[in-house]
From Swiss-Prot:
The keyword Electron transport applies. GO terms for biological process: photosynthesis. It comes from Hemiselmis virescens. This is Phycoerythrin beta subunit. One of its GO terms (cellular component) is chloroplast thylakoid membrane. Light-harvesting photosynthetic bile pigment-protein from the phycobiliprotein complex.
Length: 177
């Protein structure tokens, strides 16, 4: 996993150059937005169980066949696995948002995800829908538009962070497609 600083240093070192110019400005912006970034991650982490359960519930409500016999999440064991997997995805998205880099998500979560689900007979469409619901919910928490929130969320314009988080969820959706 490379954070924003490691990426810039690795790039500059590869060119045998000093860190400067646009790279330095990008790091300054990353640092100045650090509190917003941490508040956004805190909003996700503090509401993780609700985000995950709402996403899985929404997926099931839209496709009740999933909980019918032989459905993708029929049985307590399969439902528990579904909730666990959604929680893992959300956790790695939060890691990526905190570090400003998607490599931890790609390396530790998405690598082989589609093949694993296919081998287990888990329907990809349902997973993709749960990810889309999580993306929308996280967007609401980061942009401070979530209804009935319990905790304060990031102050100021956080649209860039919401867009960044959305990009991480898009990577998950692409990996499942």
């Amino acid at each position: 996993m490379l954070d924003a600083f490691s990426k810039v240093i690795t790039s500059a070192d590869g060119k045998a150059a000093y860190v400067g110019g646009a790279d330095l400005q990008a790091l300054k912006k990353f640092v100045s937005d650090g509190n917003k970034r941490m508040d956004a991650v805190n909003a996700i982490v503090s509401n993780a169980s609700c985000i995950v359960s709402d996403a899985v519930s929404g997926m099931v409500c839209e496709n009740p066949a999933l909980i019918a016999p032989n459905g993708g999440v029929y049985s307590n064991r399969k439902m528990a696995a579904c909730l666990r997997d959604a929680e893992i995805i959300l956790r790695y998205v939060s890691y990526s948002l905190l570090s400003g880099d998607s490599s931890v998500l790609e390396d530790r979560c998405l690598n082989g995800l589609k093949e694993t689900y296919a081998s287990l007979g888990v329907p990809a469409a349902g997973n993709a829908r749960a990810v889309a619901i999580m993306k929308a919910t996280v967007n609401g928490f980061i942009n401070n538009t979530a209804q009935q929130k319990k905790l304060s969320t990031p102050a100021g314009d956080c649209s860039a962070l919401a867009s960044e988080a959305g990009g991480y969820f898009d990577k998950v959706s692409s990996a499942l497609a």
